[in-house]
From Swiss-Prot:
Cofactor: Fe(2+)
UniProt keyword Cytoplasm, yes or no: yes
Cofactor note: Binds 1 Fe(2+) ion per subunit.
Binding, Fe cation: 643, 645, 774
Enzyme class: oxidoreductase
Gene3D superfamilies tied to this protein: Cupin
Originating gene: Kdm3
Name under which the protein is recorded: Lysine-specific demethylase 3
Molecular function terms, GO-annotated: chromatin DNA binding; histone H3K9 demethylase activity; histone H3K9me/H3K9me2 demethylase activity; transcription coregulator activity
Organism of origin: Drosophila melanogaster (Fruit fly)
Disruption phenotype: Viable but adults do not produce viable offspring. Adults show high incidence of an arrhythmic circadian rhythm phenotype with increased period length. Adults also show reduced levels of starvation-induced hyperactivity. Adults have increased sensitivity to ethanol-induced sedation and decreased tolerance buildup following repeated ethanol exposure. RNAi-mediated knockdown in germ cells of adult females severely impairs the hatching rate of offspring; this phenotype is partially reversed in the presence of RNAi-mediated knockdown of egg/eggless.
Function: Histone demethylase that specifically demethylates 'Lys-10' of histone H3 (H3K9), thereby playing a central role in histone code. Demethylation of Lys residue generates formaldehyde and succinate. Probably involved in regulation of chromatin structure, promoting expansion of euchromatin. Negatively regulates rhino-dependent piRNA production capacity of several genomic regions; may help define the frontiers of piRNA clusters by regulating histone methylation levels. May be involved in regulation of behavior and circadian rhythms.
Alphabetized InterPro entries for the sequence: JHDM2-like, JmjC_dom
Cellular component GO terms, alphabetical: chromatin; cytoplasm; histone deacetylase complex; nucleus
Length: 854
């Protein structure tokens, strides 16, 4: 395996804990010197090597361990002058301080001969052993588990001692608290957010925050240590704390080992108490782990199991900021007339503040009028009043439905006979072959039903916005990418979890930058991996010129082992978060031309990922490129197999091409046939036959609510073929399936699931909601670029998928939680509450000043 491939297996460098996944492969070659090596990739459940999770050889005695560490001490870089001076001051003053060096460096600061060494965390102990054995170590200072966490002090003899851990209430500084607690005097992290945007975010994300708040409160009841101490782990800039068991981001409450720094999240503790995640009898024990897959303690005396009664309850949020924000959220939503259906007692409280209520009522009215005025010149007081009445009616029905324990969505009619028999609430009763079943989302917002909109209604809702409906009224297509009022129709459909297509995006882009010749010129000599879409094989380390030249010339395409041109796609390029660095000009061009910029830009006020403070590790939201040859001649082979994403995304077609060195008629005929077989409606087929429209890719996007039905079908087909279902794998997340016309027909016949068949042409942008299963088949050669975002409407799906991914095997590419959705929700709510609180204070102060002046 090449160094590049090995490096690609290492998890993000910003995580404090890292994962290295293994890949099983076999190599097929042929004698022709021009042949290409293809590596066959399998998604089998394989043992993994987690770099941070290695536990020392249990057969080593304690004396041998100490000897190894002493030998490695000579290889530790000496303290810098600044570090030495700082520790001299600590020694002379005898003051208590937070550990400011990694454990492996602390012995350098303790020159007393014979003194007991400070216990090392598992990261630093692993580093010492790796150094002793001559292996390179990539552990930086900040990866130390006790960095900025453990309290230290020099005693009277000059020996360094551990004196406990920080108190979350007495030790955070004002700067630490400001990160977490809403403060009307501190500007929010996000960009410009007006009153209506804040109310909109609170409407869609407020209940989810309340659910997280109550879930965090469970930690206190789960804590089993007789020591009631709660430690505070300070948030370290540029570091993402993750659970050592499930790789989910540690949001607040978790449990920590005082000896080695092992950390485990709330959900894993609940699983252990309930007996879940227990190793199956047929599976061999994983080295260094107990029967629940928990890492053994790396204590110098030897590996030991971590016991719940000995772990220390730890919180990350400083002070009482979580409770402060939770109470403030309910007060703000009550004052600002935002419907809340979380069901907790705070949602029913009445706030007796007549003056504030009157002022806020005026501010809401003004902001609605301002928003509608920007949407349409026909806005009026009557229109605003109608919207207020509709909001009030929906809030009343939401409360009524919550008390009865059923779902309510606008437009649904409840009767005594149908109450409790809704297809959404009974959708899972007949599913049998599900490993990841969403039996219920208690405390969360439920799925809204699909929306079929008439053109007459949409025109009345947003007059002047050019648009049409495809898929029999289920797919909105906006035909002017930069129309200022697009958001009205977009939100009406997007909140129901349906995809949207926006055309004419290419007008805002410099398409010369996105041409294959431009990429071949700029990056032709750079090596990268390719994938043969016909069989899924990897073609490693090829100059990208071989790929880009094949875009327009069939004779220049790389041959497979049988001499046939391969159907290639470029794998993971540009890599990771390096798009802006590798392609700065194209990055700037894309950011300038993104449709719905309030959602898709990194600083968009409805992209709530923008609310994450700068000190946090930003989630990798792209952009990403998808470059592949057309496969219309192979209708059962997808360019991108069925999968779903944890965040929302917009995918823009920036280039469509057909090789001109051969007969193009079979390709064109196959394209039209694929569109027809794909289930596209008459309007779509007519559009694709227009001479000035070049279809690029055929999408099938399914509703997120139907993901489990799709799982059930695919698992059933797997069993019918005589294969066994793997417990820690998932037919959608594994991306092994492309639903051809036969499977799609069976899905509709047996489950009633119908997707959105979408043909993406040059300049079209397809918006895919979080959690929506989708697949893509390139009809012609395509270059697509995608940007992810986190919208308030789909926050529930993001949250649920985080929990879904943690149950995948550790070797799965989707296993690790890189979105940190709880942190995003927390800081979005914090910013909205801050802005609304500040707005009413400023208004009251302004009116008071005016009265005094009069």
């Amino acid at each position: 395996m090449s160094q590049k491939e090995l490096a690609a297996l290492v998890a993000t460098r910003t995580s404090r804990k890292r994962t290295i996944s293994s890949t099983s492969f076999s190599i097929s070659t042929r004698t022709d010197p021009k042949s290409i090596i293809e590596i066959h990739i399998f998604n089998d459940s394989l043992p993994i090597k987690r770099a941070c999770c290695e536990v020392e050889n249990p057969t080593l005695k304690a004396e041998q361990r100490v000897q190894q560490e002493e030998e490695s001490l000579g290889q530790v870089p000496p303290l810098t002058e600044e570090e030495q001076q700082r520790h001299d001051e600590f020694r002379n003053s005898g003051s208590i301080f937070l550990q400011d060096l990694p454990c492996f460096k602390l012995q350098q600061a303790q020159p007393i001969a014979g003194s007991s060494p400070i216990p090392k965390c598992r990261e630093c102990r692993r580093r010492n052993l790796a150094t002793t054995e001559g292996e390179p170590s990539s552990v930086s200072d900040v990866y130390c588990r006790f960095y900025e966490f453990r309290r230290l002090q020099f005693n009277e003899n000059g020996e360094l001692c551990v004196v406990g851990f920080p108190n979350p209430y007495s030790e955070p500084s004002p700067e630490d608290i400001a990160i977490w607690q809403p403060d009307k005097n501190t500007p929010p992290t996000s960009g410009y957010m007006d009153i209506q945007v804040c109310r909109y975010i609170l409407l869609h994300a407020g209940d989810q925050f309340c659910y997280i708040w109550h879930q965090e409160a469970e930690a206190l009841s789960l804590h089993q240590n007789t020591d009631g101490t709660i430690a505070w782990k300070k948030a370290v800039k540029g570091t993402r704390e993750i659970c050592d068991v499930c790789d989910t981001t540690l949001f607040n409450y978790h449990w920590t080992c005082r000896k080695c720094g092992f950390g485990v999240c709330l959900d894993c503790v609940k699983d252990r108490k309930e007996g879940l995640r227990l190793r199956r009898a047929e599976n061999a024990a994983q080295k260094g782990c107990d029967e629940y897959h928990w890492l053994l303690c790396s204590d110098p005396s030897g590996p030991q199991e971590h016991v719940l009664t000995e772990l220390m309850l730890t919180q990350i949020i400083a002070g009482d900021a979580l409770n402060v924000l939770g109470r403030l959220l309910h007060e703000v939503r009550t004052l600002w007339q935002v419907p809340q259906v979380c069901g907790c007692l705070l949602s029913k409280q009445a706030i007796e503040d007549a003056q504030s209520k009157e002022v806020i009522q005026d501010m809401i009215k003004e902001s609605q009028l301002k928003q509608h005025t920007s949407y349409s010149s026909l806005a009026s007081e009557q229109k605003v009043h109608q919207q207020q009445r509709l909001d009030q009616l929906h809030a009343t029905k939401l409360e009524f439905a919550r008390e009865l324990g059923v779902d309510y969505v606008p437009g649904r009619v409840w009767t005594k006979e149908t109450l409790g028999k809704d297809p959404i609430t009974t959708a899972f009763d007949n599913l049998k072959h599900i490993n990841f079943l969403r039996k219920g989302l208690a405390g969360l917002r439920r799925f809204l039903p699909p929306r079929t909109m008439t053109f007459a209604y949409s025109t009345q809702l947003a007059p002047g916005v050019p648009h049409e409906f495809l898929c029999d009224g289920r797919l909105l297509r906006l035909t002017d990418a930069m129309h200022p009022d697009n958001r009205v129709l977009f939100q009406e459909v997007w909140k129901c979890g349906q995809p949207v297509m926006i055309s004419e995006v290419a007008r805002s882009l410099n398409l010369d930058l996105w041409h294959p010749q431009a990429f071949c010129r700029d990056f032709g000599d750079k090596p990268n991996d390719l994938i043969n879409c016909l069989n899924g094989n990897l073609v490693p380390n090829q100059p990208m010129r071989h790929f880009w030249e094949g875009f327009q010339c069939m004779t220049k395409r790389l041959p497979d082992a049988y001499g046939k041109p391969m159907l290639l796609k470029l794998k993971d390029w540009p890599p990771g978060d390096d798009f802006a660095e590798i392609l700065p000009t194209r990055f700037a061009d894309l950011m300038k031309g993104l449709p719905m910029p309030e959602y898709t830009l990194r600083t968009g006020n409805l992209n709530i990922a923008s609310c994450l403070p700068k000190m946090f590790v930003p989630p990798d939201l792209g952009p990403k490129m998808y470059n592949a040859y057309g496969s219309a001649l192979h209708p059962d082979k997808g360019t991108t197999n069925l999968h779903l994403d944890i965040s929302d995304a917009v995918n823009i077609m920036v280039y469509v091409g057909i090789p001109q060195d051969g007969d193009t008629r079979p390709q064109m005929a196959a394209t039209q046939k694929a569109i027809e077989i794909g289930g596209c409606d008459y309007i779509t087929r007519a559009r694709c036959q227009s001479p000035d429209v070049l279809p690029g890719a055929l999408w099938h996007i399914f509703p997120a609510r139907d993901a489990d039905k799709i799982r059930d079908l695919l698992n059933r087909v797997t069993l019918e073929k005589g294969f066994r279902l793997e417990p820690d794998h998932d037919p959608i997340h594994d991306q092994n399936w492309y639903l051809d016309d036969k499977l799609r027909a069976r899905l509709f016949k047996e489950y009633g699931v119908e997707g959105h068949p979408i043909v993406q042409c040059l300049g079209d942008a397809v918006f895919i909601p979080a959690g929506a299963p989708h697949q893509v088949q390139n009809l012609h050669n395509c270059i697509k670029v995608a940007e992810d975002f986190v919208s308030p409407e789909n926050i529930t799906h993001c949250y649920h998928l985080t929990h879904e991914f943690r149950r995948l095997s550790h070797s799965h590419t989707n296993h690790e939680d890189k979105l940190q959705i709880k942190n995003i929700i927390y800081h979005a709510i914090k910013d909205c509450c801050t802005i609304l609180t500040r707005a009413v204070d400023e208004r009251l102060n302004a009116e008071l000043t005016k009265l005094n002046a009069d």
